[in-house]
Amino acid sequence: MQSQDIISNDTLVNLQEEYDRTQIQEVLNELNQELIGLVPVKTRIREIAALLLIDRLRRKLELVSGNPGLHMSFTGSPGTGKTTVAMKMADILHRLGYIKKGHLLTVTRDDLVGQYIGHTAPKTKEVLKQAMGGVLFIDEAYYLYKADNERDYDSEAIEILLQVMENQRNDLVVIFAGYKDRMEKFYESNPGLSSRVANHVDFPDYTSDELLQIAKMMIEEQQYCFTEEADKTLLEYTERRMKQPYFANARSIRNAIDRARMRQANRIFASGEKVLTKADLVTIEAEDILKSRLFSLPNA
């Protein structure tokens, strides 16, 4: 077909109507409202959504529309929102008609790999059966490959995944997730897998200011509030915690808030006050954070 033949058809499609009908703006708005920062991630998700929407319009005009590669890789530290974004991505794919159900199934190596011969295939196939029509999110996917373990049955799980990713890509989207450096080695060791993953999204660590915003969102959801001094103390706590081992971004902040709530409850209980105001029950004081052992660590 000549280029002039392709563009000569004067059939029109309405982009705005299609955009409104699929209601993907609702999901994109939720991403912006629910997740602090992560600008590169949000931009990448918008780009993928735009491609899929335009692809949908091309199909309406009977233009060639190669099935876009939808399998993805989410890389980044723990607590950077990978699972939350995967849920939103599943919603977008469902609204645009690329998956039938739109659910997200989160698994790890233990859900896919058996401990003895003949156990891995049925486990992996059962997980895939549950995930069909939706998105399969494999967290810490690099644990599926252990080159130094001859008795490991991971390769069988990977082979089954490869077959399904290739042959049933209209029924299932797979997202592999984990630390960036480990995921890169995982793909190097499994070139067949790497070639089937078209979209790579890197999740940056949060800044201390972004983590403070996240903390405020979390306590508002639980109907608590910080005093001005507690605000400053939590920021100092966050900056110290970021330098410590096993820091997990928003996950570590959630844990810190849970402990601050416990200290607040104990402070109120120990005060012996018989009558409490609403303010007493909702206010987190600086001392509720300062009692963290982090402030007693040398060089913390």
UniProtKB/Swiss-Prot annotation:
Its main location: plastid. Transmembrane segments: none annotated. Pfam families: AAA, AAA_lid_6. It is found in: Plastid, Chloroplast. Keywords: ATP-binding, Chloroplast, Nucleotide-binding, Plastid. The keyword Chloroplast applies. CDD domains: AAA (cd00009). The keyword Signal does not apply. ATP binds at residues 76-83. GO terms for cellular component: chloroplast. InterPro entries: AAA+_ATPase, AAA_lid_6, ATPase_AAA_core, CbxX/CfqX_mono, CbxX/CfxQ, CbxX/CfxQ_RuBisCO_ESX, P-loop_NTPase. GO terms for molecular function: ATP binding; ATP hydrolysis activity. Disulfide bonds: none annotated. SMART domains: AAA. Belongs to the CbxX/CfxQ family. PANTHER family: AAA-TYPE ATPASE FAMILY PROTEIN / ANKYRIN REPEAT FAMILY PROTEIN, AAA-TYPE ATPASE FAMILY PROTEIN _ ANKYRIN REPEAT FAMILY PROTEIN. Necessary for the expression of RuBisCO. This is Protein CfxQ homolog. The gene is cfxQ.
